[in-house]
Amino acid sequence: MAAELTSTRLNAENHLLLDQPLLRLPHELARRNFKSVQRLVEREKEYVLPALKETANASLSNEQTPDQALAALDAMISRMQGLKRKMENLHQEERKIQEQSRKRIQHLEKLHQIPSLADVQYDQWARVRLDRLMIDHMLRSGYIKSAQQLAREKGIEDLVDLNVFVQCQRIAESLRTGETKDALQWCGENKAALKKSQYNLEFELRLQQYIEMVRAGHKERFNDAMIHAKRYLAPYLETQSVEIHRAAGLLAFPPDTKAEPYKSMYAHERWAYLSDLFVRTHHELLSLSSRPLLHIALSAGLSALKTPSCHSAYTSSSSNSLSTTTSVCPICSTELNELARNMPYAHHTKSYVENDPIVLPNGRIYGQQRLLEMSKKVGCVEVGKVKDPTTGEVFNEGDMKKVYIM
């Protein structure tokens, strides 16, 4: 009884290991929102305070007419009103983030109130988490509208990161179509954070702009490309010297060159590379997992079930269609076979085998009694024959051989 209670007791801390991004992202968004407020206040303070002091001194010394002083004050008031509007927008954004965080914390707190895995409340909570993981997977796969619809139907908009992934997909798609404007704007908004990134996204975007200028192939664009390189590429000379020297070599090679590395630099596949690089950088800055959370959740279960035979040449789902239609092993299924390919095998300290094992001519081993019973249940097997439940092959009972385990 004690062992049974232990096996069904809910360990909330272990469950929450998978849900860390649920609170990490709102925290990161709140931090960035605060930094935006800080930058706005500092920028306006640097302008308004000196301007106010200068206007006051000029008025006292009669260097300005009353109309000039009023015009200067109007300009400062206009800037402060603009600051107020921006601050109000940021305040509304902060309230949204706080409300989102509150609902996410409430969702996680429910787990600590569930005593057992057998409790019906756990089934309800796990269903919500599965919906979250599905929406996360759809967002990362580009099925934005489907993800939004599912979130609305389930009423969990605040538990998923719709807006973040919508923006990410929009910018990634613009890069695939050959447009750098949105990505560069995003880099400008996150300039401070990008300095700590392991990726060099902004440099790669500026390099692509340079490549497109050189691709045009006429003198005026060459001049523009050199000016662009001095302004945007030269600051990276210490860290990206090899790429910058290669970029300079592009001036001597036409877009249809076969010489490497210039052929690869001119290749249109670079846009797909930039799109993937942006997604990796975006996820890194927002502390998002590079893999879908659904894959991470499945990994533990896949590893616990995986055996060496799951990816053998004979039973592989990619090479044996008959096997996939009859096998009940999740690892051998078409949907999960590739996902589990790089997972480690299950670590079993004990083996469980039938007490009457036999081997069929195709090398497969089964319990004799269970195999005979299954063959009878199938009904389409002749008397004195048995059917392999995995491959569907039929053999004579006399072809079965006893297996001895040493």
UniProtKB/Swiss-Prot annotation:
One of its GO terms (cellular component) is cytoplasm. InterPro entries: CRA_dom, CTLH/CRA, CTLH_C, Fyv10_fam, LisH, ZF_RING_GID. Involved in the proteasome-dependent degradation of fructose-1,6-bisphosphatase. One of its GO terms (biological process) is negative regulation of gluconeogenesis. This is Protein fyv10. Belongs to the FYV10 family. Residues 164-221 form the CTLH domain. Pfam families: CTLH (PF10607). A zinc finger (RING-Gid-type) spans 329-391. Residues 126-158 form the LisH domain. It comes from the Eukaryota. It is found in: Cytoplasm; Nucleus. PROSITE patterns: CTLH (PS50897), LISH (PS50896), ZF_RING_GID (PS51867). Keywords: Cytoplasm, Metal-binding, Nucleus, Zinc, Zinc-finger. The keyword Metal-binding applies. GO terms for molecular function: ubiquitin protein ligase activity; zinc ion binding.
